[in-house]
Amino acid sequence: METDKTTYLRKIPARRSDSNKGTYGKILVAAGSEGMCGAAYLAGLAAYRSGAGLVRILTPQSNRLIVQSLLPEAIFTGYDTDSNFRVLSEANVSWADIVVLGPGLGTEALSVTLVRELLQTIAAQCDIAMDGNGVLRSEAEGAEEDTEKSPESEDSAPSAKNRLASEHPESSEKMRSKWLRKCPLLLIDADGLNILSARPELMQLVDHIAARIPVVVTPHPMEMARLSAASLQEILQCPAHAAEALAEAHGTVTVMKGSETIVLDADGHAFQNPEASPALSKGGSGDVLSGAIAGVYAVLRADRIDALNEGTAEEQRTLWRRMAFDATVTGVLLHAEAGRQAARIHGTHGVLARETADMLGIVMQK
């Protein structure tokens, strides 16, 4: 298992002199619940501090005042029990390049509805732009009807796909080009994972998506136990085995969080953070990590976008998957170092998650 952090930290590019906010991605953070708006704020703050161009926070309407006061740079989109979650999901997923789903979301019925609609919309957009085998469509292939069915539920992904396709009638080549420019990523954390673990049909949707675009999951040991057949004790004894099994079963980049966090993907890449950062053992640190990974992905994407538009479809997908792994490892390393740097100011016992987030940009600059 790889442990050389310099390999990844050297891959952080300088910010392009000709860039604008769109260059560095549009990140949708679907997070927070009533009484837990901090998770949405921390993930959004970390995304901005690690390089993201635009962040939109999708959270209950009751969180508006606090979130907009703490992070006025973020776009706020609120919802409540009367919201049309289908329309809400389609509008926000269409806007975003990167989706962070789950921090502080809760597992109540409203949160489950939001997760279901977001996953169905992402799956539908994947199917419009890609064929049934997860290969980017060509012009000729796009003329044919895609007959593959994704997992069924009350409002299945295929029906969402047909609706979106009829509302956005573009040539398949244009859709393919837009898809490559977006290079979308889905990251699922915290209550997003807890909702999946209790609903196999939603986990099947994630499998469907992961066969088409990179999906990152970031469980801690208890969340991993809920997602897998392994017990908590087995996971603690051999976290790498649990992470490898989840990555292979679902095609994800899997982050097994711990004192020495492990990152594995379905292509066989594996990395272990060689240096613990005890200052991170505080509430909100996982939310910061999710935002950091998303922000780093946006930065790497801006640097590698030209290479991603060259070569065969399979070569493009290989680069795309590798970029997701690189961004995840780099995010883990930056997060750990930011915690250590924050501890120099506030002490190891005294670091708050937002202070770790605030150090991300400084660590990246170094």
PLM feature spans:
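Substrate-binding N-lobe of the ribokinase-like
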Residues: 20-75, 81-83
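Charged C-terminal helix
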Residues: 336-366
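Short glycine/serine/threonine-rich phosphate/pyrophosphate-binding segments
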Residues: 35-50, 56, 108-111, 193-197, ...
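Glycine-rich phosphate/dinucleotide-binding loop and adjoining beta-alpha-beta core of small-molecule
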Residues: 1-5, 58-275, 310-319, 365
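Short, small-residue alpha-helix embedded
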Residues: 226, 282-317, 323, 328-333
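Short glycine/threonine-rich catalytic loop with a Thr-x-Gly-x-Asp
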Residues: 16-23, 34-36, 277-293, 320, ...
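Glycine/charged-rich beta-loop-alpha catalytic/anionic-binding loops adjacent to active sites
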Residues: 21-29, 267-279
